[in-house]
């Protein structure tokens, strides 16, 4: 008898595998077909939303990216609605839609983005993509002099953080104050702090008296000084010197200041120096030709500031020439005529507001074109006309004042647009004077710094209504670092 199995019995396991494979493939095909049918009937769906809450309130041209679950036909600006309304543009590619906002949004606010008529290529069904985003809140860094014993909201004493350490009362303190919470946190403290600025995840701090300045870079962790990281002490151009007019590039790649050699007891070689944070961290003079040059005699400076969101600086020289300097040294400087004062920048930073011998103009930094600044009735009817601070492309605030019978100045703040000027209802004590008015990065708030014979105070007010949001017993806040500095007027 033969022991061989029939051929069909040997093939039976293979046939069983084939049947299972065919069945599985059939299920996958059916599932895919059903999904395709459902997708064709329902239209695309929202899969993901990405955005930077802090960037949306501090910088223009920030994007919210909506990602769908499939490729999309082109989406136009007319298909997108933002509530509350905010100027925006729209681009789409593949399965993503980018909503780019023209300017910073309001702090701590919800915005709904709706996209209608969304369709996949070749599919008849349309759908609506809808999402709600929440913007970030804001805070300020304020300099509290050593003589101050309180900070935070008016009437609230003490601070949190490291403010309770021994000896803190004898030191100046840089504190962080959030507008959506009471109290303040000490970020850094040292003797004789004169200026400071945020530099990425660090602080640049200038300190010293009697023409002997020091410049330190302080690492931060959790928003306060990192105790595990040593403070970096910069080597200055001479053994003794005075540092003023500190400014930092928005990207944190560099910072600069006005420096005067005081080794002889007099100020010599006063001019602009910049520090490249990607290089040696050594201050380099900006030469008279407008180029950073090691060892050069520096360009004289009356006022200067970084152009927002660039590595360029706008400089008014000691002879009132205007020069646009590339701090990185990659492009040649551009000379833009002359001016008697730099007020600040408009919107995205391509336009500056400057004072000339014939009036205040808007200077286009791309082509040098000058146009008169809007000055409706009531905006210049005062004996004293102070600094202009732009809130947006069309609106600015300005400190003006009249002389009282006793010779003191009665100051007020005007809010000015193209057609009218109105007084912002901000109370200035009779015994105090306004030393600075500085907009928040999105123009929603103003920091109004006042000084009396006995105290310093910074009031944070709504830029539209003048309503008080917070107050700090401090001399200055970091918002003012965006304004050109040098020879100052309020």
Regions picked out by a protein language model, each given a short descriptive name:
Residues 2-139, 166-170, 180-201, 206-208, ...:
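Acidic, low-complexity Ser/Thr/Gly/Pro-rich repeat segments typical of extracellular/periplasmic
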Residues 138-149:
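Short beta-strand segments enriched in small/hydrophobic residues
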Residues 148-176, 210-221, 261-276, 316-326, ...:
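Structural motif
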Residues 180-182, 211, 223, 278-280, ...:
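Short coil/turn linkers that define WD40 beta-propeller blade boundaries
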Residues 255, 313, 352, 396-397, ...:
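Acidic/hydrophobic-patterned starts of short beta strands in beta-sheet-rich repeat architectures
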Residues 258-263, 267-287, 294-328, 399-403:
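N-terminal low-complexity, intrinsically disordered tails enriched in Ser/Pro/Gly
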Residues 320-323, 329-354:
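Beta-propeller domains
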Residues 453-490:
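Extracellularly exposed regions in secreted/surface proteins, prominently low-complexity, repeat-rich
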């Amino acid at each position: 008898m033969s022991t061989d199995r029939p051929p069909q019995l040997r093939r039976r396991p293979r046939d069983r595998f084939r049947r299972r494979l065919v069945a599985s493939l059939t299920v996958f095909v059916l599932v895919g077909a059903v999904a395709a049918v459902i997708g064709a009937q329902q239209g695309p769906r929202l899969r993901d939303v990405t955005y930077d809450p802090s960037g949306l309130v501090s910088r223009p041209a920030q994007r919210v990216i909506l990602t769908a679950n499939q490729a999309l036909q082109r989406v136009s600006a007319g298909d997108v609605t933002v509530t509350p309304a905010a100027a925006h543009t729209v681009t789409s590619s593949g399965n993503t839609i980018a909503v780019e906002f023209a300017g910073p949004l309001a702090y701590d606010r919800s915005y709904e983005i709706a996209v209608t008529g969304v369709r996949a290529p070749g599919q008849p069904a349309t759908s609506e993509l809808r999402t709600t985003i929440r913007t970030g809140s804001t805070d300020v860094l304020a300099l509290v002099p050593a003589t101050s014993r309180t900070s935070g909201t008016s009437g609230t004493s003490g601070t949190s953080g490291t403010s309770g350490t021994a000896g803190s009362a004898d030191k100046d303190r840089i504190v962080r104050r959030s507008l959506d919470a009471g109290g303040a946190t000490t970020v850094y403290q040292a003797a004789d702090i004169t200026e400071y600025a945020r530099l990425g995840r660090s602080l640049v701090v200038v300190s010293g008296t009697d023409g002997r300045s020091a410049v330190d870079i302080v690492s931060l962790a959790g928003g306060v000084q990192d105790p595990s990281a040593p403070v970096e002490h910069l080597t200055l151009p001479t053994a003794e010197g005075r540092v003023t007019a500190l400014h930092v590039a928005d990207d944190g790649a560099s910072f600069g200041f006005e420096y005067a050699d005081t080794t002889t007891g007099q100020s010599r070689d006063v001019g602009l120096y910049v520090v490249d944070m990607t290089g040696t961290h050594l201050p380099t003079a900006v030469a008279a030709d407008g180029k950073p040059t090691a060892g050069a005699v520096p360009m004289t400076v009356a006022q200067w500031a970084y152009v927002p969101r660039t590595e360029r600086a706008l400089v008014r020289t000691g002879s009132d020439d205007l020069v646009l300097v590339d701090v990185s040294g990659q492009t040649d400087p551009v000379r833009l005529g002359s001016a008697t004062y730099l007020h600040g920048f408009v919107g995205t930073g391509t336009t500056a507001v400057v004072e000339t011998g014939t009036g205040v103009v808007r200077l286009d930094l791309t082509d040098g074109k000058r146009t008169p600044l809007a000055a409706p009735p009531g905006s210049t009817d005062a004996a004293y006309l102070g600094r202009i601070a732009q809130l947006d492309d069309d609106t600015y605030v300005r400190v003006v004042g009249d002389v009282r019978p006793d010779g003191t100045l009665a100051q007020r703040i005007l809010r000015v647009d193209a057609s009218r000027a109105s007084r912002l209802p901000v109370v200035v004590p009779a015994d105090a004077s306004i030393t600075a008015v500085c907009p928040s990065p999105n123009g929603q708030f103003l920091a109004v710094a006042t000084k009396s014979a006995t105290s310093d105070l910074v009031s944070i007010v709504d830029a539209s209504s003048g309503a008080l949001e917070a107050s700090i017993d401090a001399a200055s806040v970091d918002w003012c670092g965006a304004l050109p500095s040098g020879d100052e007027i309020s």
